[in-house]
Amino acid sequence: MVLRLSQLFLRTLREDPVDAEVDSHKLLVRAGYIRRAAPGIYTWLPLGLSVLRKVEDIIRQEMSAIGAQEVHFPALLPREPYEATNRWTEYGEGLFRLQDRKGADYLLAPTHEEMFTLLVKDLYSSYKDLPLSLYQIQNKYRDEARPRAGLLRGREFIMKDSYSFDIDDAGLDASYAAHRAAYLKIFERLGLEVIPVAATAGAMGGSKSEEFLFPTEIGEDTFVRSAGGYYANVEAVTTVVPDEIDFSNAPAAEVLDTPNTPTIDTLVDAANQLAPRSESDGGAWTAADTLKNVVLAVTLPTGERQIVVIGVPGDRGVDLKRVEANIGSHLPIAGEIGLEAANEEDLKKLPWLVKGYIGPGLSLDEPVLGLEGSSKVLFLVDPRVVSGTTWVTGANAEGKHVFGLVAGRDFVWDGVIESTEVRAGDPAPDGSGPLETARGIEMGHIFQLGRKYAEALDLKVLDQNGKQQVVTMGSYGVGVTRAVAALAEANNDDRGLVWPRSVAPADVHVVAVGRGDEIFEAAEKLSLELEAAGLDVIFDDRPKVSPGVKFGDAELVGVPTILAVGRGLVDGVVEIKDRRSGEAENISVDKAVDYVVNAVRTR
C-alpha cells in the first residue's frame, strides 16, 4: 500500500497543543495521529488508526495462540446484570449512567464481566464445555474526574478484555498462567518494556492479581523492586511484621501535660524535654516512638460517610492509595469509594476525639477508639503495631499525651491494615533485600476472579458426577489505546516519534526532494516497487512543499526508514536514513528496494 501525502487526511502541527502534558500526547496530536473531541475523548485519524490496528492484530494473534475466541459485546448495557453484582452502585461516580425514553436504566460499559458470565450461562451447562476463554477488543467508558495525559487517562478508551471459565481452581491456575505468558509475548512483540508486579484486586474482586507496568517517570502507579527479584505495586506491598514483645514487666502508662504539641515534631521535642531517655532505654525520643492516629472519612458508594481511624508509627505517612486498596476487607463494600482526611464537621460529631491529641484510650477498661470504644469508630492499625510495642500517643485531652501505652495491654484494635507509605530502603517482604521505588503506567492487569461473578449471576455447570458446580473465572485486560500512548512515550526524540517496526504506520517514508519531474518520477517508481515487494509506503508527493518541511514531517511522523530522492539522483544514488539511529547512507537506485526490504525484515 502506498499512502500519498497529497491525498492523505493529515495535518501536522509545529507547536504543542496547549492542553498536552506529556510527550505522547504532544506528539500524537502534532504528527496527526489523533485529535481531541472533548476532555478525555479522542478521534483517531488515518495514521493513528493504522498503529492502533497493528497493536490490535498482535493482541489477536497471541490470544488465538492460547485458544481464546473473539466475541464482541455492545458498549451500551442494561442495568440489571450490574445490579446483580452490586457494581451499579459500587462503581460510584465513575460509571456513565443513562436512561432510554421509557425510563429504563443503562450504562456505558467500564468492563464486561457480567455480560461474559451471562453469555456463557446462556449457552453452556456441562463441564465438558470447559475450559473456555473468550475475549473482545471494545470501547470502554469511565467518567474520570480529571482526564489527563492524552490517551493515558481518558473517558473513552479501547481495551482487550478476556475471561476464562474453568470447572475448578487448578483449571483457573492454568488459564491464568496461559494469559500471563501471552501478555509477556504481546508486550515483547510491541517492543514495550513491561514489568509484571504483584497487585491488589480492587473493585474487580478475586484473589491473585498482577499488573504489567511500563516504567516511566510520568506513571501514576508506584511500584517497588528489590535486587533479589521482588516486584509489587505499592498498594500490594506487605510490611515485615515485628515479633510480639512480652509486656508483663512493662511499667504502667503515664499521662503527661504536653501543651502546644498537636504535631509529631512538637510532641517529640516535648518528650525529650519532659521525659528524656538514656541510651540504655532507647535513647532520644523520635517520631517512630509515637503512635499517630489519622482520622479518615470514607464515602461509600451509597453516599454514606464513615469515619475510620488508622494508628501508624509517627515517622510514617498514610498512603491513601494503599488505604483504598485494602480498606475493603474491613468494610462491607467493594468498588469505588471516596477517601479523604476527616474535616472539621466530621470531628464535631466525635467529641471524644481531640484534634492533635487523639489516642486509642488509656486502658482496656476505657477504650475510646474502636467499635467497642466510646467513639464507635473503626480503629485499624499498621502491622508494626503488635502486642507489647510501647507508644507515646494522644490522651484525648487538649495538651495531654500518654507515655508508655502498651499495645495489647492498654489498647486493642479492630483490624490491621497496610496503609503507610512504602519507602526506598524498606525490607522486601520475601527477604530479597531492600526495596527501591519507581513509577510506571499500568498496561495490563490479570485477575483470578474465582467465583464472585459466577455466584452472583448463578453460572453453574454439571460436573462429572452430575452435580451443579459454580464455575471459576479469570479476568485479563490490556489497554489498547494506552499501549499506543506508551509506545509513543517510549519511542521519541526531539524531532518526533520513532515507531518500532511492529506497529509503525508504514515501513518506509519516501520523500521527493526537488522540483524536477525526474526526481518525482524516480521517487514514485521506488514507492511502487517497495509496495510490490510487500511493504507499506508513505510517499510525500506534495508538489509545493519545501524539502525542510518534508523532512521535518517525515521525522515527526516517525516511520522507521526514510528514503530521500533528491540531488543525488544525478549520481544514481538515493539517501536511506534510519530514523532511530539517525544514520544515513547513499545507496544506488537499483539496489535501494532490496536494501530497504532487507532492513525491514532483519531489524
From Swiss-Prot:
Keyword presence, Iron:
no
Q: Give the function comment from the record.
A: Catalyzes the attachment of proline to tRNA(Pro) in a two-step reaction: proline is first activated by ATP to form Pro-AMP and then transferred to the acceptor end of tRNA(Pro). As ProRS can inadvertently accommodate and process non-cognate amino acids such as alanine and cysteine, to avoid such errors it has two additional distinct editing activities against alanine. One activity is designated as 'pretransfer' editing and involves the tRNA(Pro)-independent hydrolysis of activated Ala-AMP.
Family statement: Belongs to the class-II aminoacyl-tRNA synthetase family. ProS type 1 subfamily.
Q: Name one GO biological process term.
A: prolyl-tRNA aminoacylation
UniProt KW keywords: Aminoacyl-tRNA synthetase, ATP-binding, Cytoplasm, Ligase, Nucleotide-binding, Protein biosynthesis
Q: Where in the cell is it found?
A: Cytoplasm
* Domain remarks in the Swiss-Prot or TrEMBL record: Consists of three domains: the N-terminal catalytic domain, the editing domain and the C-terminal anticodon-binding domain.
> What chemistry does it catalyse, as a reaction equation?
tRNA(Pro) + L-proline + ATP = L-prolyl-tRNA(Pro) + AMP + diphosphate
Pfam families, per database record: HGTP_anticodon, tRNA-synt_2b, tRNA_edit
Q: What one GO molecular function would you report for this record?
A: proline-tRNA ligase activity
Return the InterPro entries for the record. aa-tRNA-synt_IIb, aa-tRNA-synth_II, aa-tRNA-synth_II/BPL/LPL, Anticodon-bd, Anticodon-bd_dom_sf, Pro-tRNA-ligase_IIa, Pro-tRNA-synth_IIa_bac-type, Pro-tRNA-Synthase_IIa_type1
**Does this entry carry the keyword Protein biosynthesis?**
yes
This protein is called Proline--tRNA ligase
One Gene Ontology cellular component annotation?
A: cytosol
Query: Which Enzyme Commission numbers does its entry carry?
Result: 6.1.1.15
On assembly, the entry states: Homodimer.
